[in-house]
Amino acid sequence: STSLILDNTLFPSSTLSGPYSVVKLLIKGFSLDSKIGTKEQWQRLLNDLNKCDKDINMVFDKYHIDERIIDNLCLAVSGLEYRNWLVFLYFKFNVNQIQNSYLKLVVDETLNFEDFKTNLMVKITEISHKDRCFRRLYDERKKLVKDFPEEDIAIFVKANEIDPIESIYRLTDNTLLEKKAVIKWITRNGFSEAISEIYPALDAYLKRYIFDCPVLARELTEYFDFYKRQKVENRISDDFIKLVEKYASSISYAQLPTRDNAIKAIADKNKAYLYWIDALGVEYLSYITALAKEKGLSIHTDIVRSDLPTITSVNKQFYEQWAGGKKYKEEQLDNIKHKDKGGYFFTDDEDPIHIPEELEVIEKA
């Protein structure tokens, strides 16, 4: 029974009714509110305490719950089972020992288990990016939720839309969903200094790439800097249209060497690996350069042109006739940009939300 009634005692006594009251009596210094658990949960905890020498830490040990639980937090809090609730109870009971500031904030301010996972997702939306603690909370939350599935992150993305001025600062590059949200924000609000912090890959893509080829270096630098920003913003300015018409009428691109000539210039093809990313253009050079630098690699770039029309069927002889033994063709970028199987349809969403997946293809390559 979970009720203890003592009649005719020699000393003052009180009545304990319900499992929570008994749990509170058994655990020294237990001050958690009864509302954080149901009667059934408290009863099961009481049963466990009676089997574990009335020691709550032994109960946590029984279910393999300790400070390492934070490393697999998604699994630990996803569900409504008794152990999931015990994880929440563990955090509430040990709140002062929590090292992750964001988790500590969420645990402190969450009153019941049912709201715990949602609060992990959305608590950051209540904090201004100007708050002196924001950056630390942002970074610690990012690590904390990195393994949560997109269906959980979607709750955060939706809640984060309420304040457009603040929302960009809270997004991360943990998931494709958030990366797309960054793109959508830019199409509506323009560029923000926050992009370099929240989405470094996009920032690297947008960096101005300085061409140093023998011909058209200035023109290519100007054109592709202009082009990339408009691609992300999903708009075309009149000035850019004039620039396109100017270059198209002058046929200045014909001054560049052909791709086939660049391939032929490789002296020892047996020591080279031909890696063809179909639909890869010079717009990605700033991003590719950043990736190479990050990996400690050196990079040499020759700027060339393909034959017109630029469809793959007309521009693949360099690959088919490659004299070296090692080659590979990556088609996913072309699928994303040009084909239905890439999964992006302008009729479904006019925003350029395909850009994050384009960058992911290049990163994996």
Language-model region placement:
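…; additionally, a secondary subgroup of soluble metalloenzymes is captured
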Residues: 1-272, 279-365
